[in-house]
Amino acid sequence: MFLFSDGLQSINNNNRRKRIVKNAYIPSRGIRKIPHLSTLLPEFHICKDGKEAEAVVGWGLRPTTHKARAFAAEHQLPFIALEDGFLRSLGLGVAGYPPYSIVYDDIGIYYDTTRPSRLEQLILAADTMPSETLAQAQQAMDFILQHHLSKYNHAPELSDDHPLRSPSKPETVLIIDQTFGDMAIQYGGADASTFELMFQTALNENPQADIWVKTHPDVLCGKKQGYLTQLAQQHRVHLLAEDINPISLLQNVDKVYCVTSQMGFEALLCGKPLTTFGLPWYAGWGVSDDRHPEINRLVQTQRRATRNLLQLFAAAYLQYSRYLNPNTGEAGSLFDVIDYLATVKRKNDKLRGELYCVGMSLWKRAVAKPFFNVPSCRLKFISSTQKLARVKLSDDARILAWGNGKEAIVRFAEQHHIPLLRMEDGFIRSVGLGSNLVPPLSLVTDDMSIYFNAETPSRLEYILQNQNFDDQDFQTALKLQKMLTENHISKYNVGSSDFTAPSTDKTVILVPGQVEDDASIRYGSPQIYRNLDLLRTVRERNPNAYIIYKPHPDVVSGNRIGHISPEDAARYADQTAEQADILTCLQYADEIHTMTSLTGFEALLRGKKVSCYGLPFYAGWGLTQDLLPIPRRSRRLELWQLIAGTLIHYPDYIHPETHQAINAETAAQILIRQKNMQKNNNGLHRGCFAKKLGKIKQLYRSFK
């Protein structure tokens, strides 16, 4: 998606394909359970025993690798050390979040400076690095800083009212503590005395500065032990124990001291002066003030040379690390991971806190739960507002409602001053109807209103009115438009392509029917809200047109109201297309006339003229002919901007099997595959047994 991502991924994949596949013995069950491990290690066939092993793989320098290392030494086999990459995941590994990147080291491991590592060799060779690689590195660095990305990405930003954000704060020094048992300390030439020396030096060298010590949140609650907790009780020293996004913290200090923490390198990325007291992988190259006495020996033995920050970054993040495409599970690039983490980090921040779903059916709970499975969201289900009134709510509590929200829920939220989030199916939904219990691939979560309620601005309307759309949005929107139109993808993807095309020279107008008690009509079509009235009005305004009426699939399947008798339809329409796929009907239409139907948006994607008799989300931006004014939508949009806001920035997508977050392109690809598999079944009349079986499967996957 990013400028260099396709080229970089191609280079990585080509290099991997050239490798000869060998049998790799991996004793650790935990390593073997890493999702898509074979994709990360394409040169190996993974074995559970060492009978035919040609290499042995273990996890860094953990004590659990002693057996694997001993086996490799005994059988004179190469040992490969793996570790988490520097951009790993949204949440912690101990919380079940799999890695999207690993490092692969056939020499040592990067945090062990007692001997060489593959990363060290890559940095030493970085003086011959191609300019193209350095350009990629610069772009990646910029994106990481822009999106505040780190190894883990669940922590909140430094709050707006934090003293470190005060414009009148004095010079600020950050000292980074680490936890006992961190192997980077042991193998980085440090111990408790190193931390004491760092602390006293920082105080002595900065007598007028405010000193802040960043320690791990588990230290203060007693789960782990740090080195500086007691020392930090001194005057001028403030203890930071809360979880804070590292980049947002580092950007608000003036100077940083560390021993071996990876945050030290991130401080360099943020342009902060860094003083090191251990032997981290980034020390000794001339980019930091290094105080460890062994640095000189590393230089003298030619294990260090002068390198710049960009070269260090390129070696560590582009060459040393391997990546998955988190959307597909296939081999990916650094830019795939940056793009993905930036997206899911925004989602995690949006959903941060306690969310109470009130009065949802078991099915709706099963549908919703996977979309809120992010580290900082505490999703809770409760049967009624009466029960919620007896709950002691946290300061960050919000209520989550389906659609526009039942009146009792909305009233309760207003009376108790509790913020209300609303959710609804997304626009690329499924192969099959929601009323047939087919779960969605996408949901929208709106903290302002909901997209179909024209009575008040929604988050989608805010995005369309204010978003600074960029070139990435442009490219992705065009790609999505092409995928959806060429593969005939709509919201539900049901119906038959068996359609009698009109043989006429008249203007062909398609009138899509809607579910008449649907909220989009109640809140978005104040003048015309019945299908028959719409059909009559369209005929009155277009007496010479050829009109095709397409009933809504939920109405045809008998699940919802809005039926027009054949006799009434025939009075105003030249043709009724009951079973036909809506996109097939669109192919033969010159214009689409609608109250608020999503078909209007799908028609815009296909270059059709659209007339709106209500106020759908896509009306009022200069792309449609609107019968009703909506003055607050004052921006004139191009079609690609409407697509970007509606399909990229507003919804969330998940994989139907893994329930992992995916992007809009991957969701479209999944629907294309599903639709091709079901092309011989129109899917409107889903049998009772199929409904129940699908419901059971969804419930099991969501609550297991």
Curated annotation (Swiss-Prot):
Subcellular localization, as worded in the UniProt entry: Cell inner membrane
A Pfam family per the record: Capsule_synth
Membrane in keyword set: yes
Membrane topology field: Peripheral membrane protein
Any GO BP annotation: polysaccharide biosynthetic process
Gene Ontology CC entries for this record: plasma membrane
Keywords: Cell inner membrane, Cell membrane, Membrane, Polysaccharide transport, Sugar transport, Transport
Biological role: Involved in the phospholipid modification of the capsular polysaccharide, a strong requirement for its translocation to the cell surface.
Protein name: Capsule polysaccharide modification protein LipA
Organism: Neisseria meningitidis serogroup B (strain ATCC BAA-335 / MC58)
Protein encoded by which gene: lipA
